[in-house]
């Protein structure tokens, strides 16, 4: 009887305990924290350079902040959505990127960083396994960092 219960426990437990999903969700927490740190750093540099209240108008006239010799386009002092993935030190084998366009098809309004192997989310997805960075939309506003992990 004890052996049978042991076998049942070993075969049934993985169905109730989602270690892999919890690990992926935890990794997304790290990605979100990295996004927050990177955008806070760029915002501090934007304030020093006086571009913290400037709006990104288009790809050719964006205000920029110099970061380690690279110009980073900013929207109201925070990284433009298309720039955020370049500021993160993430492995391309583990994570993918999807850009969501706003009302202007040329302008990216948010970026999704998703866990590879969990399906590529649509740009406007509301479920899956990803972190969405949305750039600020007005002076004084801050970017949004949304973790979606119901598909991990």
Residue ranges and their predicted role:
Residues 1-20:
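N-terminal single-pass transmembrane signal-anchor helix
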Residues 1-3, 41, 141:
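Short, contiguous, well-ordered secondary-structure segments
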Residues 23-52:
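Membrane-proximal N-terminal amphipathic helix
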Residues 47-152:
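Periplasmic/extracellular, small/polar-rich flexible segments of pilin-like filament-forming proteins
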């Amino acid at each position: 009887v004890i052996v049978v219960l042991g076998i049942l426990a070993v075969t049934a437990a993985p169905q109730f305990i989602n270690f892999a999903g919890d690990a992926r969700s935890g990794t997304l927490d790290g990605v979100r924290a990295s996004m927050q740190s990177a955008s806070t750093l760029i915002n501090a540099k934007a304030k020093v350079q006086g571009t913290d209240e400037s709006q990104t108008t288009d790809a050719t006239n964006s205000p920029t902040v110099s970061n380690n010799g690279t110009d980073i386009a900013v929207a109201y002092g925070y990284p433009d959505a298309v720039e955020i993935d370049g500021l993160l030190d993430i492995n391309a084998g583990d994570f993918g990127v999807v850009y969501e366009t706003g009302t202007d098809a040329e302008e990216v309004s948010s970026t999704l960083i998703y866990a590879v192997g969990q399906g590529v989310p649509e740009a406007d997805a509301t479920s899956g396994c990803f972190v969405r960075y949305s750039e600020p939309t007005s002076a004084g506003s801050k970017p949004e960092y949304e973790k979606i992990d119901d598909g991990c």
